[in-house]
């Protein structure tokens, strides 16, 4: 019985949450080339929709941010030159979205932006390792 419960828990942990699945679905594009503009537009609208409907917690949104950064890195390995600029503009757009939706909660905005800064630092390291 314990083995079944442990196995069930492990399976539950491995299945992506609904927001992560939605983020993945919303960012699917044809082929391997990803349009940065499309990613930014779809991502911003996804976050805004989920927050305005109360469907996603801050933690869910942070998971989607990380997923998007990973997907962008994965799909743009051959052309890393424009990634930094893309991420910078994408982060700015996301910051504007967060402030518009969470202006009542300064701490949440600060935490979100601190997370973004860490994500950019990690993303830069990833890009450097890809281009070597």
Task: Provide a role label for each language-model segment.
Residues 8-16:
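Bacterial N-terminal signal peptides
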Residues 15, 25-26, 38, 96, ...:
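Compositionally biased non-globular segments, especially hydrophobic aliphatic-rich helices
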Residues 20-64, 128-132:
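Immediate post-signal-peptide N-terminus of mature secreted/exported proteins
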Residues 32-35, 61, 68, 83-86, ...:
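Stable alpha-helical elements in mature extracytoplasmic
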